[in-house]
Regions:
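ABC ATPase nucleotide-binding domain
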Residues: 9, 29, 65, 351-353
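ABC ATPase nucleotide-binding domain helices that frame the ATP-binding cleft
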Residues: 47-50, 146
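Glycine/charge-rich catalytic "coupling/switch" loops of P-loop NTPases
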Residues: 227, 256-258, 262-314, 342-371
């Protein structure tokens, strides 16, 4: 999908509020028909970026293009984008039909065309049975679809969504997440979706843009972001439980390259050149996900296991199908994930294996991935 020509082009976008940088030098292409998620913690700049695309905030610097037209000087109504707010902004006293028709009537569209377009959108979003109901009497799913339909009916080229599922209870959020993704696939519209919820971004987005303190940390597919985080921030932000981090020192012993933390060490001969080139100080942060630390008694894929390491079990948190286990080794407390059926208790000693093929390496000075 991302091979399609870009429909949105952001070039060196910057936004300051009273001298505080909210968005710094953001450049991005969004492909036609793509579902891209802007992900990051509160205050990272993701909503500000969305509002600049919509025309609700004026960039301090940079350009915004929609296809071959530069739109950042234009008012919101002339940009060809639709914005779906977190609170839906419906007219509660009006019917679903009148909510859908409102934008067209304001634009002076003829009654016949208004009716045709409203009914077309209502059918595509399965709203036909509730068109005459007041918005205040709709269930949350229908409210979501009316808010989306009200934007679709004016035929925007791009849909911008600012945390539209934020007010839903967890179970309903999962249902609506799937419904929204299905709608996007069936309509084929380009969507830019802002969320602080990594599960939403990783399950819905064709690509995910991760932001932190106004800067883009990484733009990639969900799979690549999880498997190959580009920065220390992305590595720690993506994944639950979070990645374990261990400060190490690069050493060469008998011609072999190692990363060492006290008595712990990992041979990294295949990554030696990258470490020497990208971490000249010799200091390296090793990251390993909890699921890549395994009890030695459980099967580990051949050729990927590391050395067996005795640890002390500090805490066991049982979940539905797995357990999160805190283990102590030397001065470290690491998290690991085991199957829910695996018997383990706090206080016992356990032999574990850290999968050396799953180590992530970071330069503590640049905070970027090595290799």
């Amino acid at each position: 999908m991302t091979d399609a020509p870009p429909i949105i082009r952001l070039r060196h976008l910057r936004k300051e509020f009273d001298g505080t940088i909210a968005v710094a030098d953001l450049t991005l292409d969004v492909a036609e028909g793509e579902f891209i998620c802007f992900l990051g913690p509160s205050g990272c700049g993701k909503t500000t970026t969305l509002r600049m695309i919509a025309g609700l905030e004026r960039p301090t610097a940079g350009e915004i293009w929609l296809r071959e037209r530069r739109i950042d000087p234009l008012p919101p109504q002339q940009r060809g984008v639709g914005f779906v707010f977190q609170n839906y902004a419906l007219f509660w006293h009006m019917s679903a039909y009148d909510n859908l028709a409102f934008g067209l009537r304001v634009r002076g569209v003829s009654p016949a065309e208004v009716d045709a377009r409203v009914r077309e959108v209502a059918e595509s979003l399965e709203l036909t049975p509730v068109l005459r109901q007041r918005a205040s009497r709709l269930d949350l799913s229908a409210m979501q679809r009316v808010a989306l339909g009200r934007t679709l009916v004016v035929q925007p080229q791009v849909l911008l969504l600012d945390e539209p599922l934020n007010n839903f209870r967890p179970g309903l959020r999962e249902v609506m997440r799937g419904e929204l993704k299905r709608m996007q696939l069936s309509l084929g519209r380009t969507m830019v979706y802002v969320t602080h919820d990594q599960e939403e971004a990783m399950t819905m987005g064709d690509r995910v843009l991760v932001m932190h303190e106004g800067r883009v940390e990484q733009v990639a597919t969900p799979r690549e972001i999880y498997r190959r985080p580009a920065t220390l921030f992305v590595a720690g932000f993506i994944g639950r439980p979070a990645m374990n981090f261990i400060e190490t020192q690069y050493q060469v012993e008998d011609g072999r390259a190692f990363l060492r933390h006290d008595a712990l060490r990992w041979e990294i001969e295949t990554r030696r050149e990258a470490v020497e080139r990208q971490a000249p100080s010799g200091r390296v942060i090793v990251g390993i996900r909890p699921e890549d630390i395994r009890p030695a008694v459980l099967a580990v894929p051949e050729g990927r296991r590391g050395e067996t390491l005795p640890v002390q079990v500090d805490l066991v948190q049982p979940l539905a199908r797995r357990k999160i286990v805190d283990v102590k080794v030397l001065d470290l407390v690491l998290k690991m994930v085991v199957p829910g059926t695996f018997r383990v208790d706090a206080g016992q000693t356990l032999d574990v294996v850290m999968d050396r093929g799953a180590l992530h390496l970071f330069d503590p000075q640049t905070l970027r991935a090595i290799g």
